[in-house]
Amino acid sequence: MGKDMHRPGQLDQIAAAFDVVLIDCPGREGAVVRAALMVADLVLIPCGASPADAWALQQSLDLIEEARGLRPDLAVRVVITRRRATNLGKNARNDLAACGVPLLGVELAERVAYQLAMGEGRGVTTMTGQPDAVREIRDLADAVDALLTENHDAASSVAHVA
């Protein structure tokens, strides 16, 4: 799909063909991001664990608020990434909670394993000797699955009432 994924109807066709579609978008405004927000059931916003990252998060939050004008039930979670074992990293959850968007219960630590996996062109869950990174990614997948299931069940309940 690439840069042409915002063609009218294209995302709707793909979404209709699969149970789950993951769309990795740039963290800035643009036609691709706007198109993805119009079909998304869940938006995950990765955010580093520093004050500068929290400040940069605001642009994404502004775009999501705009999308919620048309999609008021759009589910959004901030995922803390690159969290270090420092006081700054430990306080990131409280600091980011002030942004007003619910945080996902899973955080991804700053790990060499993620960089190695990317450099090798594979997922960290296929690597040996990286149990902490594998656990984090599996926990992330479980949390996303639970949110999608919760949102699907809520939508089904609304559909049955109507």
Q: Whereabouts are the PLM-identified features?
A:
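P-loop/Walker-type NTP enzyme "switch/lid" segment
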Residues: 1-23, 27, 34, 58, ...
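Structural beta-sheet core signal
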Residues: 23, 45, 78-80
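Short, structured loop/turn "capping" segments at alpha-beta junctions
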Residues: 67-76, 86, 103
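NTP-binding/hydrolysis catalytic cores, primarily Walker-type P-loop NTPases
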Residues: 124-162
